[in-house]
Amino acid sequence: MKWEVVIGLEVHAQLSTQSKIFSGASTAFGAAPNTQACAVDIALPGVLPVMNRVAMEKAVRFGLAIGATVNPVSIFARKNYFYPDLPKGYQISQFEKPIVEGGQIAIRVGETERRINLTRAHLEEDAGKSLHEEFEGSTGIDLNRAGTPLLEIVSEPEMRSAAEAVAYARALHGLVTWLGICDGNMQEGSFRVDANVSVRPEGQAEFGTRREIKNLNSFRFLEQAINYEVQWQIDLIEDGGKVQQATVLFDPATGETRAMRSKEDAHDYRYFPDPDLLPLTVTEADFAAVRADMPELPGEMAARFVESFGVPELDAAQLTQSLDVARYFEAAAAASGQGKLAANWITGELAARLNREDMALAACPIAPERLAGLLVRIADNTVSSKLARQVFDALWDSELSADAVIERDGLKQVSDAGAIEKLVDDAIAGNPKAVEEFRAGKEKALNALAGQVMKASKGKANPAQVQDILRQKLAG
């Protein structure tokens, strides 16, 4: 039997605010346990929540960016459940009337591009954190995180593979960081993914029973967890078993999921409107202020890169996955006048070096204007593409310009026809077998001769001229 995979994601994005959603306590990460939890956060009797309007503005920004309906009036509700790190015994969330409804996220898997519909995005408070490993035989509770503003972003169950789910999560991560509403730090829990996974026979309209994989904090774990869970469900059903709705955890050490508890439905949480909070209103002035502060969106910028710099669509999409990368590219392309070359170097050599150094682009020692200087010299044939990598390495390790490095290290490309012709004559005279093979129709023999010329010139000869002169000489 052929099976179809059905995946929907719930993403919890911590909003980048200075204070918590219903109190003035700090949201800074890394403070000593329980030093950033005020009376509201720990639910002392008599305290009342006060809405942080900055969190509302960030939710509105997200809604506008995805083409969603942003409700002018939304309602906070109490989600009732007991857990040690939830002091009130309920979580303030949104249920029947969220701030954002609908919208779409564009994803690309290979050459295929499609759009994933969103169900909703709602504001809520984060819970505290249970610390199991630090205390032998007991559990510690850190309430610093309690009350941190979250935007829970819920997709429709439209993804059909782990690859699509990862593409969606990456696109969403890129968007919330682009918009400046979330720092996206998955290691610190700023962007956490829950995956609802089920399988059904191909062609069946009814969904299978889903299991929810909780708190995945890397794209690699998301892919591994979904792939394992899909195969586990298929094996269970084919062996005559039945999938039970459950919440499961993924163990990175074993690559397996394991059931944590039976999965609750909405009625289990006994939602009702929070009597301590007025309906959240977004005024026309609020909408206008958010629109005025909206950055150019990734899709819009990618289209402009194609139009203004002649960059291929795939490269433009890659360059606009991060606002930092997009801005770096635009500065380098504008300064050099070499859009395609800038795209190739930024997505190739620069990205590889940053990856090797485990470094963010913000810490890159080569400013876009310095890279532009190198691109200009590649374009005007002052330096060959091969020797340009040596120049790039020197730029990384120094504050010199590309021109200064080329001059200092004698890397200027030899484009003098007479000088190259002499090197070609020497290569032909010294490699009669390669000459004979080329004239017999073996094209690869020409590359061997060109390699000898490049070796003799220490990589400085203009490769295109070398090829042209070789062909002229060997045709005679």
From Swiss-Prot:
A Gene Ontology BP annotation from the UniProt entry: glutaminyl-tRNAGln biosynthesis via transamidation
Keyword Protein biosynthesis part of the UniProt annotation: yes
UniProtKB keywords: ATP-binding, Ligase, Nucleotide-binding, Protein biosynthesis
Superkingdom of this protein's organism: Bacteria
Keyword Nucleotide-binding attached: yes
SMART domains: GatB_Yqey
Enzymatic reactions: L-glutamyl-tRNA(Gln) + L-glutamine + ATP + H2O = L-glutaminyl-tRNA(Gln) + L-glutamate + ADP + phosphate + H(+); L-aspartyl-tRNA(Asn) + L-glutamine + ATP + H2O = L-asparaginyl-tRNA(Asn) + L-glutamate + ADP + phosphate + 2 H(+)
Annotated SUPFAM superfamilies: GatB/YqeY motif (SSF89095), Glutamine synthetase/guanido kinase (SSF55931)
Enzyme's top EC category: ligase
Enzyme Commission number: 6.3.5.-
GO MF annotations in UniProt: asparaginyl-tRNA synthase (glutamine-hydrolyzing) activity; ATP binding; glutaminyl-tRNA synthase (glutamine-hydrolyzing) activity
Subunit structure: Heterotrimer of A, B and C subunits.
Family from the record: Belongs to the GatB/GatE family. GatB subfamily.
Protein's job: Allows the formation of correctly charged Asn-tRNA(Asn) or Gln-tRNA(Gln) through the transamidation of misacylated Asp-tRNA(Asn) or Glu-tRNA(Gln) in organisms which lack either or both of asparaginyl-tRNA or glutaminyl-tRNA synthetases. The reaction takes place in the presence of glutamine and ATP through an activated phospho-Asp-tRNA(Asn) or phospho-Glu-tRNA(Gln).
Name assigned to this protein: Aspartyl/glutamyl-tRNA(Asn/Gln) amidotransferase subunit B
Organism of provenance: Laribacter hongkongensis (strain HLHK9)
